[in-house]
Amino acid sequence: MYREDYQRAAQAANQLLRSKNNRYLDSLDAGNLGTTQAIEPQVRSWSKLCGWRLTEDPQKDAQLPVQAAAHWLRTAALNGSDAVFYLQKAENNLSLLYGSAQPPTFSSLLPGCRMELVPCFSPATYQISGILVGTLHTERLADAVAADTALRDIYIAVLSLPLSDRNVEQLLQKDSALLGQLRAYATADYVSGSSTRRVVQRPVGSIPQAVTCLENEIDNLRKNQGTGFAYTAIRFGAASQEQYRRLLALLTGAMQSENTEASFEPVRWFTLSPTVRPLAIPTAVEQNKVLHIVSLNTLQDAAVACTPPQRSYPGFWLEGQSDEQLFPAVEAFHSSGLAMKIGTAIETSEPVMLSQ
């Protein structure tokens, strides 16, 4: 009976290590993913962010968009709503859309925020698309994509399925209970020596690694319990194989991290069938359970991934940038009053009007 208890504990540890941080995905390829039970974020309202007005404080200008995205995600989580940050480039024209149950209240945090409701928005279908999961340790993702002029017909979508505070507490309790059970079997007594017999403790199988994994996850849950968590995935696609490979390299490069703790989930990706909808999350089967391909992330990390660019681009204009910052991305503007045509914008071929 004593030996059987250790065997059951070792088996539970192996199963836990395979499931935590999506390690089971390492043995799968895209052909193992299912789409019949795929889910899509439930979004009722889409809003396009066209730009905002910078302050005179560069540090504040860098913090405000992150705070706005974090507030948007936290509000969605408290309302039990999914959220999607959708970035699209079409011939270098940039579109940034935020989707959730209600329009985001960015204007309360971003000065001069310009947002437009986009009724009946439907994401475009691309020739080739994929899904990427992992810990969202990334900064200025939108800038990296927008600034790459070789990416002319692509999209990325950061999908966020927030956990309620109650779900986080339940996960914390489940992990804590399992941790207590595994700790009791992490080591076993062994008799060493013949003439001078002594008892030493040795680790049992992978139980110590499972204990460390649980400790890291519990620590992460407790540290960020007040700000929230979400299951996330990044869907992305392009109009050609060349652009798809370039976009994939950019995304994986942007999500590199020096974090080597057991709670850190490495980046994994799969190229999907063209029939998979652009915001769908496919499934995989693990231990006879159907699991959706998502990663557990803090809302704060998800917010950083959903942050708009810190420079102007065609289709997205930051008011107050210096001339040398704005020049490559200057866009045509229109005045509601008297105006005089002074030329044609190179990027958009639209008439440029000078207000009188």
Which residues make up each language-model segment?
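Extended, folded cores of ATP/NTP-driven motor/assembly subunits in large transport
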Residues: M1-H334, A339-A345
